[in-house]
Structure formats: C-alpha cells, structure tokens
Amino acid sequence: MDDEETAEIDETNSAAADMQVELGPEQLQQEMPQNGSGDGAAVSAIAAVSTAHVNSRARLENMIEEVDNMFEEVSELMVDVTELMRRANELREDPGTAALAENARPPAEIEEQPAQQEEQASLPYDSPSRASISSRHSGSDMSLDSPGSEDDSDAEAVPRWMIPANRVRSAVDMLVSQARNRDGGIATLLRRENFLQRVRSMVFSQDRIRGRASDEANADVINTVPDETPESPPAPLDVDMEEGVRFDTNLPAEHSYFGTNLNRVPGVDYLEVGSTHRMLIFMHQHILFPGEVLPFMIHGSIIDEEIQDSGRDGVIFGVGFPLMQPPDDNPHKLYGVTCQIYEKGESGRQHVFYKSRALQRIVINCDDIQGPPQYIARNPTMKCYSKVKILPEYFLPEPLKCIDMGSLNRFRDIPSMEKKFRRYQLTSTPWPYEACEEYSFEHIVEKARQKLEIHKIDTMPKCPIQLSFWLVRNLHLTEKMMRLTFLTDSVNIRLQIIDTTLKQESLFYCRYCNSSLAYCSDLFAMSKHGVQTQYCNSAGYIHETNTVYRVIAHAIGYSGEPSTEFSWFPGYQWHIIICKFCAQHVGWEFKAVEPNLAPKVFFGLAGSSVRIGKTSERTPTHGSTFVVRNLLRLVSRELE
C-alpha cells in the first residue's frame, strides 16, 4: 500500500468520524457543530455537508475494498503457513530430523503464551473441516455460534506461534481501538511492513484475556464429550416458580425514577395522513415505533418556548433516525416518528423530565432542516425545525370477513363453528384459498401469541395497526428486519414480514466483538410495555433496554460498584456489566434488594451495545461486511 493510498485511508476515516458512520454511546457525547447564523447560512451548510457525505461515501467504499483485499492476503498467508507447518510436522516424524526439530523452538516470550492456543488450528474457512468444527459448542467466551468467533477447540493442535485464521478479524478490531495512541494513527497501523506483526501480537493479547476469562469453562469442556450437533437454546426459565412477590410491571412503565412531581400535559390529535407540518426536530440513536414511550431530560426552555410559539396546550415534535438508510432514489430523506409529550416534571437543575409517546411515522426532507440537528439523548440546547410529512398506514381486512353470509353471520364468531363457517365462505367466493390466506392475519397473531407466552406478555393490542408495531418491539427482530417493517406502509405486508421471523432462533451478540451474550428465548417483560423499553439515566442519556432472565455462562464481567440510585426498577440495584472478551459496556445486572421480590436477578442488555442475529449465521474470515463496519466504527470513535 503506497503513501497516497495510506493518506486516502486516513482522510476517509476522518470523514467517517465527522459523519458518525456507526453511532455508538460514546459518539453521542461528542459536541455537534453549532451554527448561529441565519437560515441562508444554515441551508448552505447543510448543502455542503450533503456534498461531503456523497464524496466521503465513495472514499469509504474504496477503503472497504482495501480492507477486504487485506483480509484476503492475510488468509492466503495463513494457508501457506499451515502448509509449511504440515511439512515441518512430517519432518519431525522422521527419526533423522527429530533432533533438529526438537531444537527448533520458538522464542521464550512466545513459549509463554496460553496453552489454549495448542487446541487451535488454521483451516480455510470454506473447508468442510472448518464447517464441522464451527458447528460444535464449547464453553468458551467466543463460542455459541458467534459470528466471527467460531469454536475451534476440537481442531488439530498447531504450534503456539501460529495465528489461527479465525482470530484475525477480532484481533484487528482490538488493534484499531488502540490506534489513537500510536504515531500516525490508522495510516501507520495499516502499513504492510508492520500490519501482520501487530495483528499477531494482538491475537496473543486476546488469547491471554480469553484464557483468563474461560478457565472454568474450558475445564468443563475437557470433561465432556463433544456433541456433533449444535446445542439448542436452553429451556426458558419460569419466574413464576420463584418464591416471593412478583414484581409489578406497571412501575417501570411509569418511569418513577423521574420522581413523583410529574404533571399531565394535554394531548394532541393525530395529524392527517399525507399532510405536511413544520415542527421541532430531534435525532435519536434507536428506531422508535408508534406506541413506544420515549422518556428524556432536556433544558426546559426549549419545550416551554415551543408551547408559547405554537399557541397549543399540547406539545408534538419529530424524532429522526439517522440509522435508517434513505432510499437510493432520494438520499436526502430522513425517517422518524412524531412524539407527543404527556407528562413533565422538574429535575431541580434547570432541566425538565419529559415522558412522550410515539404517534405516527414521518419522513423528513433534509433540505428543509433549519438549525443544527441535535440528539435528544445529549440534552440539546438549540432548536432545529423542519417540514415533515405524515406517512400512511394501509390495512386491508380479511376478504372473507367482508362477505355477507346472511343468516349464517351469527355463526362467524363461535369458536366451534369457525372452521366450518370458513369453508362455507370459501365455496361462495371466486378467490382461491391461497389468496384469502395471503391477507389473513389472525393465524399470524395466534402464532405470535404462542411465541410470546414464554415472555409473560399479556398486553397485546387488538388494533391491527398498533399490533404490527407492538410485535416488532417484542419479537426481537434483527436491525435489517426492523428497518424493513418501519418503511412498509401496508399493515398486511408488515405482519407477513413478521411471520417469516417467528420460527427463527436468535441470539444477542456483542456489537463490538461479536461474542454471544444471551438467548432471545430468555427475554421476558419487566414492563407492561414489553421486553424492549426506552429508559433515561441521570445524565440524560436514553438507553434501549432488553430484559432477559440470564446471560450465557462466562460471557460477562462487572464494572464499578452496584447502586440503587436512579434505578429503573424500584426495589432493584443495578450493576454495570461488560463483555468479558472485549470489555465493552453491554448492559446492567439488576438484583433485588427488597426481600421476597421476584425475580431475584435479571439482566438488561443495552440496545446500542448488542445486536440480534440468528444462531446459525456465519461471518467469513476475510472480506466480512461486519468486520469492515466494526473497524470503521472503532476508527471513527478513536480518531475523534
């Protein structure tokens, strides 16, 4: 890689940092540029940012291609080294060369690396042996079918100075996080002459961490016979079997940690579909769906002035989602929701607590934004306005329910007659059975109800429109599926998309190193709003929290001391938990401090630190899109 390419990579990563390519909790703490000039200057600034965005995207694509090529080169080197080591082993078996092989020992510092590396092998990722090995389950931190960290504990032993090929990706992630402390930053990091040496060093560092974290788990693996089939998710826990008083799920929904001095705010009517309105705009790092509650804390003057300017009693504002990718035909669109404030209270430090509820989906034209966009999770101090358009919600009722069967209609809602009545209806219509089933949503609702029974959720809405959004929040869909359902105007299609995910078994993965953290089957509702809820901490930062009964053994560590201050769940203390492999914050452990309170312990996983993926998914060793995204995220965060 020549100096010109290196400089271009450095420039691209700087641009990625400015644009916040991958938003994380730390990035939200950075100050955004603020422009106090008039509307004309603001529009010019936005146009300049849009142009820079297009140019930077092209540079980012070039960098992704460079990184892909780099991983391919490393993979090829691993194959060559594997072949050399195979030949070396053959020579060791030769009595004539046994003495020479015995004397050919690695340096002392490498000899001190964890003995766990003796169990690892470097195989081509697409080989049958690799696929067989990757499907097995071990107790290590990076197993459990975690993408990018396939289990290799049953592989053929290799010398300690070998770098397993399936560790290169995670080594690069950790290596990049230290780029800021190096002279020359990421450009120096990626130079060919020292890249492999530093990756090798980082692999050994990771293995030392992994060895310390999973000694107990590895001992269990040694004493058990490996299973040839992937391990299925454990049976869900039943919190009702615990002794004690069941926690009141209404308490978290009230957000009582804001205090008791909250006043009701008059409501507002739904806005007409297709209409355009100018309103106050904030940004948010998560995707909100209509019906979801958003608690936040900002300077009181922003909302108070908005009430005075609008002349209305109620307050409605827009929340945009930068993570929602705009359509290719119109890259200047930003999607979001309207939110209505329904309660507020003083915090005692010139900030006001607000509780709001998402109402309708909207689309924002970025060319119309007036003022600096600010994140609602960072206590914004300046106003930003834009014109928004209310998106429609189309719902087609089931065709058979639109047919008047005369005197037979009285049998329509009798459960014992339902199937027979349906057959009568089908014989009287020109539509085939498949066409009627395509627009039927009752069987989808019933399958979703059965799946959610294990989560102890009994607040399922009956309105199809509200139900479609509610299911997205409680069925732990992947980020791709969440975006797809949000952009869908048809409720019927939205429910069909949800139906395709009901049979999938999913895991929570660490967003930084891809370690497996928890099974989605262990989700349960600690709030009447469901398993996924937005909460606000004492600093004003909003966390999307997923509550689970348990996490995977040896997957987490702890940071700091437990505390009951500003606890989202009354009667519980919280303790920060971190990924045991990469030491990144991934959520909190909640432990009951009041006697006879059930559950005794549960965990809240932060949506900004975890991602949802299939248990069967695999990520290639080289050329991985996830690796490139993760690398860019770490680069932009470290270079800011």
Swiss-Prot record:
GO cellular component terms given for this protein: nucleus
Keyword Methyltransferase: no
Domain of life: Eukaryota
Binding site for Zn(2+): 510, 513, 579, 582
Entry PTM: Ubiquitinated.
Domain CULT: 505-614
Composition-biased stretches (Low complexity): 113-137
Sequence segments annotated as region (Disordered): 1-25, 92-159
GO biological process terms on file: positive regulation of neuromuscular synaptic transmission; positive regulation of Wnt signaling pathway; protein ubiquitination
GO terms, molecular function: metal ion binding
Subcellular location: Nucleus
Extent of Acidic residues compositional bias: 1-11
Keyword Metal-binding annotated: yes
Pathway: Protein modification; protein ubiquitination
A Pfam family per the record: Yippee-Mis18
Keywords: Metal-binding, Nucleus, Ubl conjugation, Ubl conjugation pathway, Zinc
Domain Lon N-terminal: 278-506
Function: Substrate recognition component of a DCX (DDB1-CUL4-X-box) E3 protein ligase complex that mediates the ubiquitination and subsequent proteasomal degradation of target proteins. Has an essential role in mediating growth by negatively regulating insulin signaling. It also has a role in maintaining presynaptic function in the neuromuscular junction synapses of third-instar larvae.
Quaternary data: Likely a component of a DCX (DDB1-CUL4-X-box) protein ligase complex. May interact with pic/DDB1.
Recorded family membership: Belongs to the CRBN family.
Protein name: Protein cereblon
Species name: Drosophila virilis
Gene that specifies this protein: ohgt
